[in-house]
């Protein structure tokens, strides 16, 4: 029997109907897929770790009956997108459950202060407290613009943890001025000790509300850095979970990323805010217990790191005045220079995008006549710039582009609209060695190039007084190593690099002065030896072969044997104990990898890296102690004189002082710089400049000579 094949040429509208029927059939078939089959299909997809975790949470919740599909989706094929929508619902349900549980389990000694009788009773109780924990809840993190929503306090002696709401959207609460005026005498009383977590922020916020917090005794965030600088997180909730065995959710986990504390209901706000100071107090007790077993560290913390936080607050609040008009003019000149350089480079390299490695690499390979590993400036291009002028021009062009786009055009945009200043943030625990870092608010003062520093100016009637710790780390190395060549140079007040270069290369001292290749090589070599820099990296820094760099290091260590001995002894101590001490055992740098017995090449590299860091950490960490101790003393000087701390950048300290400053004032500043912290028998030195514009300074003699001319004119 012959099978007939019919070909139907249907009108287009009928074809569409057939297609719709076929889609409906497929949809019906998909709808008959079991949930088990659907999950198998979805989990077999290429999912990120985060998505997979969320999908599994939804699967378990659906199987437990905690969540289900909406009626609108019931007839559709179960998809990954729907599953992730369900995860968001599940997360919301979990947030609501956690919040309800928190409120239900609110401890009896957590009190909400919402009327005058309760507040007056609290003020009476505070009179009996030698120390309290303090925290603020705010509308945001802008310490100059945002508002305090509420204040939480822990009263250990009374065993009370209270929250005082003052700007919540709903609920009975006291007027902000009434509460702040009432708390002001307590918070400004130095006799009542204060414990905070991230104290700088809260001190800033309260200062913006007319309260100058006195009596800071402890900051659990900075104290943690002395107990373990290698913590993954210094957030209160993370530390409480880890050390107090008190699992605590973050604000974002409980309330969502964009939530504002003023929108949180008061019963919820109480348990969250009061728990913050409760945990802060418990963490303080934990930290003090452990630091009391290390009395030298505890003494350093209380005498330097704690008072330093007040200096940090004042530095940040002072802020920098930016010369906006100069920035515009300088930026326009720079833009024209960049365009001219770009045009000249394209004439030599071709009409390419100079910022595209894919286009730049082949163009450069044609110039150098060989393949290049990459267009990396430091590793590949800098070693070639002396041979190929076009590469030197390219590097200059890239530096200009970076300077313009990262600094000159950006700095004026970072001026705070309320204060008219650029406010950097200073983190006294920015590096694990204890060195400062500067960041936040979009500006990093540590990497401001000299050209960009011109934008920072003193306000009318003021000047910038700057002093550096001259050759701070090398003086520190001289102290630890007691290397005769270093000690002799400093005792005689000579340039240490020139002295060592003359000794090392067998040349007269006068021929190894500033700017000579010998002095430059010695400066790089000394720092490289202290920091464990290998021959490969040193060869790039010196612009020589690896063999020549290795020979330099061998000769250096042979000639300066005490440096080598100290480095070896420090590494041996680190390998035995897994840490190194800073000067006078005031801080530790923990390097646990140094104690490992390596089982493979990767672990061997980790051990070698940790051992290299040991001597480096001692030098950098002890230098940081000198800087911080001096800053505390300078802060005291500023308060006496009516001056202002402006900033600390690398080994430089900046102050704002009246332009009527006298030689006696400068001498007092110099004494503090030189005498606050000594490296044993190694004399300190500071180079002082007086500036109207940062980076364009006068020596002390030049400044006062100019002043004398102006007055006599």
Which residues does each PLM region occupy?
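Core structural elements
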Residues: 198, 248-249, 272-288, 295-321, ...
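Mixed-charge, glycine-rich, non-catalytic linkers/tails in nucleic-acid processing enzymes
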Residues: 214-215, 242, 249-353, 481-491
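Active-site-proximal helix-loop-helix substrate-binding element of RNase H-like nuclease domains
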Residues: 6-13, 28, 39, 43-46, ...
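Catalytic palm subdomain of template-directed nucleic-acid polymerases
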Residues: 226-229, 313-338, 477, 534-547, ...
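Non-catalytic nucleic-acid-binding interfaces of large nucleic-acid enzymes and RNP effectors
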Residues: 2-88, 162, 230, 337-463, ...
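Catalytic palm active-site di-aspartate
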Residues: 219, 276, 280, 308-317, ...
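A common structural junction motif
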Residues: 560, 671-681
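Acidic, glycine-rich two-metal-ion catalytic cores of nucleic acid-processing enzymes
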Residues: 90-94, 105-113, 128, 133-142, ...
């Amino acid at each position: 029997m012959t099978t007939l094949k019919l070909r139907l040429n249907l009108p287009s509208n009928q074809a569409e109907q057939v297609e719709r029927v076929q889609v409906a059939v497929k949809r019906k078939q998909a709808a008959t897929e079991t949930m088990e089959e659907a999950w198998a299909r979805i989990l077999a997809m290429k999912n990120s770790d985060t998505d997979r975790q969320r999908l599994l949470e939804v699967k378990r919740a659906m199987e437990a009956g905690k969540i289900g599909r909406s009626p609108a989706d019931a007839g559709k094929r179960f998809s990954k997108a729907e599953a992730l929508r369900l995860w968001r619902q599940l997360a919301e349900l979990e947030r609501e459950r956690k919040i309800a549980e928190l409120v239900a389990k609110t401890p009896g000694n957590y009190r909400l202060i919402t009327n005058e009788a309760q507040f007056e009773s609290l003020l009476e109780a505070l009179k009996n407290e030698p120390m309290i924990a303090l925290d603020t809840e705010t509308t945001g993190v802008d310490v100059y613009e945002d508002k305090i929503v509420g204040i939480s306090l822990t009263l250990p002696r009374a065993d009370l943890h209270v929250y005082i709401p003052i700007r919540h959207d709903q609920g009975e609460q006291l007027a902000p001025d009434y509460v702040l005026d009432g708390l002001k005498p307590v918070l400004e009383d130095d006799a009542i000790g204060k414990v905070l977590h991230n104290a700088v922020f809260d001190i800033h916020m309260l200062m913006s509300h007319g309260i100058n917090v006195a009596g800071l005794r402890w900051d659990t965030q900075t104290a943690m850095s002395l107990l373990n600088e290698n913590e993954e997180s210094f957030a209160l909730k993370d530390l409480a979970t880890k050390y107090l065995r008190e699992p605590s959710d973050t604000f974002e986990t409980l309330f969502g990323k964009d939530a504002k504390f003023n929108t949180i209901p008061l019963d919820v706000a109480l348990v969250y805010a009061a728990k913050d100071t409760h945990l802060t107090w418990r963490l303080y007790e934990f930290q003090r217990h452990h630091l009391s077993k290390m009395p030298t560290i505890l003494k350093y913390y209380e005498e330097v790191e704690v008072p330093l936080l007040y200096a940090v607050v004042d530095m940040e609040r002072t802020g920098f005045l930016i010369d906006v008009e100069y920035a515009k003019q300088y930026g326009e000149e720079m833009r024209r220079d960049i365009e001219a350089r770009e045009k000249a480079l394209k004439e030599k390299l071709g009409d390419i995008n100079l910022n595209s490695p894919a286009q730049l690499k082949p163009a450069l390979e044609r110039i150098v006549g060989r393949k290049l590993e990459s267009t990396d400036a430091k590793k590949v291009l800098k070693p070639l710039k002396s041979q190929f002028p076009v590469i030197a021009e390219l590097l200059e062009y890239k530096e200009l582009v970076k300077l313009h786009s990262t600094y000159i055009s950006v700095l004026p945009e970072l001026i705070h609209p309320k204060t008219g200043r650029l406010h950097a943030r200073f983190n006294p625990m920015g590096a694990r060695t204890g060195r400062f870092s500067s960041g936040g608010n979009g500006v990093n003062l540590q990497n401001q190039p000299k050209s960009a520093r011109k934008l920072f100016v003193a306000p009318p009637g003021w000047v910038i007084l700057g002093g550096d710790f001259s050759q701070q780390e090398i003086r520190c190395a001289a102290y630890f190593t007691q290397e005769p060549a270093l000690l002799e140079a400093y005792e005689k007040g000579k340039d240490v690099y020139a002295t060592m270069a003359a000794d090392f290369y067998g040349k007269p001292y006068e021929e190894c002065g500033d700017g000579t290749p010998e002095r430059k090589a010695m400066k790089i070599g000394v720092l490289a030896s202290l920091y464990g820099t290998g021959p490969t990296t040193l060869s790039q820094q010196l612009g020589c072969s690896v063999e020549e760099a290795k020979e330099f290091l061998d000769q250096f260590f042979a000639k300066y044997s005490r440096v080598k001995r100290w480095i070896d002894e420090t590494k041996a101590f680190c390998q035995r104990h897994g840490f190194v001490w800073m000067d006078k055992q005031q801080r530790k740098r923990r390097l646990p990898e140094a104690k490992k017995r390596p089982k493979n090449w990767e672990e061997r590299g980790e051990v070698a890296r940790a051992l290299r860091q040991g001597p480096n950490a001692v030098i950098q960490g002890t230098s940081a102690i000198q800087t911080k101790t001096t800053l505390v003393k300078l802060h005291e000087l500023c308060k006496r004189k009516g001056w202002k701390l402006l900033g600390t950048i690398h080994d430089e300290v900046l102050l704002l002082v009246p332009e009527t400053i006298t030689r006696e004032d400068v001498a007092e500043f110099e004494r503090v710089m030189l005498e606050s912290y000594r490296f044993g028998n190694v004399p300190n030195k500071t180079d002082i400049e007086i500036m109207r514009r940062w980076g364009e300074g006068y020596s002390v003699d030049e400044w006062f000579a100019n002043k004398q001319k102006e007055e006599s004119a």
